[in-house]
Swiss-Prot record:
Function: Could be involved in insertion of integral membrane proteins into the membrane.
GO cellular component, one term: plasma membrane
Name of the protein in its database record: Putative membrane protein insertion efficiency factor
Pfam families, A to Z: YidD
Topology class, membrane: Peripheral membrane protein
Cellular localization per UniProt: Cell inner membrane
Superkingdom in the source lineage: Bacteria
């Protein structure tokens, strides 16, 4: 339980830093992102959906694609995988309680 709380705190901290970037730094630089949603919006959604580790990895990959030689366009955050039901991972033939 304590570990999950720490990951949640880290996620909130990263999202807060991204919001500060959007409010303070981004207006000074002007719109530069080739994608929709913007890279900062993508990062906030990815961290909120997947947590700080995988969300940051997805955001870093997205930033790596954000350059003049990439066409850009619509690039949403992938959907979170559905949690498997207990019966889908079981190979037995009997009913489940």
């Amino acid at each position: 339980m304590q570990v999950a709380y720490h990951w949640q705190v880290i996620s909130r901290l990263l999202i807060a830093l991204l919001r500060v970037y959007k409010l303070v730094i981004s207006p000074l630089l002007g719109p530069r992102c080739r994608f929709a949603p913007s890279c900062s919006d993508y990062a906030m959604t990815a961290i909120g959906r997947f947590g700080p580790l995988r969300g940051s990895w997805l955001a870093a990959r997205r930033l790596g694609r954000c350059h003049p030689f990439h066409p850009g366009g619509f690039d949403p955050v992938p959907d979170a995988p559905a949690s498997p039901s207990p019966s889908s991972s079981c190979s037995c033939k009997g009913p489940h309680p």
